């Protein structure tokens, strides 16, 4: 009987120590939704149209989904996020097996210079280039395929920006 008690105590101690470092909620020390974020529409420095609308929209959605910050919409956010879309690149990933000059898949990459400032102090808490990527399979109409992939590309960029803001690794 004594052997089972020690085994049970050991299992409970081992199980409890496995969860010792886990933290529920935001990992940057904030209480969830304690601060609010205002997202200013991004500037487009590329020749590709409609990028900034998708990026701004997806960033707002991702911030709401994450829950670390409350989304502010009327110039009253504690943190103001702004940025510029700086690069849009389409790179060949794979080619058709029957014709080595025909591209089968592209990797789309979107880069943005993102800045986050505290409204009250003006202190810059994030200022770096963030990249989002996605893969597309070429169909008969490359332009339509790229247009359909734009929300996915913007969502990946928004996810990366939100992670930088929420985790507080500035």
Model-based region annotation:
Residues 20, 118-126, 133-170:
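C-terminal/domain-edge helix-coil "capping" segments
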Residues 6-8, 40, 48-55, 78-85, ...:
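A generic short-segment signal for beta-strand/edge and adjacent turn/coil regions
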Residues 18-61, 68, 73, 120, ...:
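A structural "domain/chain start" motif
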Residues 65-70, 75-125, 133-145:
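Surface-exposed short loop/turn segments
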Residues 45-57, 103, 107, 143-156:
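Soluble non-cytosolic domains of exported or imported proteins
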Residues 2, 9, 29, 73, ...:
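Generic marker of residues within folded, mature protein domains
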Residues 1-19:
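Sec-dependent bacterial lipoprotein signal peptides
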